[in-house]
Amino acid sequence: MRVNLLGVVVAAAAALAGAVIAASLLTGRGQRAASDGPGVSPAAAEIGGIPQQGIALGAPDAPRTLAYYGDVQCPYCAIWDESDLPGIVDEYVRPGELRIVFRGLAFIGPESDLGLRAVLAAGLQDQGWNLLNLLYANQGHENAGWLTESSLRRFAASIPGLDADRMLADLNAAEVESELADSRAAAQAGGVEGTPSFELGPTGGALSPVSQEELESALAG
């Protein structure tokens, strides 16, 4: 009886610790967004020197493509960007084995739409992933005013080579509208109902859904 009770206590303690860690990560994002200057995503250093084409990260001729569906206000996307993406980039993208295409969605609200448009507009300058990482690193509370044209200008100004004025002018550009429509269509076709979601397959071929839990083994396979 004592052994069983100890097991229950240990399991409860582990669950509580996991909840505390997750809450700490999510709360910390809102606090960073209120700081004086933009924080830096761990992924930012990882993507340095890797080719970007619009919303794609990695060599165009990489044999495999990972479609990543994300919302700039999704806290779990931000956690994935911070904890999982750097390792994937280092192991698969930088060596030229994988290309990641961001499929932006705006599930959460109007600030999701504004932030996504900014990422796509930055992508017209091949800086989309740099801005995406920066937004995740400075993610605030959902639709609480952390994403405005003013804050986006500040974020953009901290990225070398990104023209903030041009980015803001392109928020409603035809290319941005086209990318928005393409991502919505791809998400609908793939049955995507939440973020982050993933599809993996040969570059130029059909991509298949893969769960976040299975992504690591699928990439290694």
Question: What role is predicted for each listed range?
Answer:
Residues 30-51:
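N-terminal low-complexity, Pro/Thr-rich disordered segments
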Residues 59, 67, 91-93, 160, ...:
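Generic structural signal for beta-strand residues in well-ordered domains
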Residues 1-34, 85, 157-221:
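C-terminal cap of thioredoxin/glutaredoxin-like
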Residues 58, 96, 126, 187, ...:
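Glycine-centered flexibility sites
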Residues 62, 70-154:
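Structural alpha/beta surface segment adjacent to cysteine/selenocysteine redox centers
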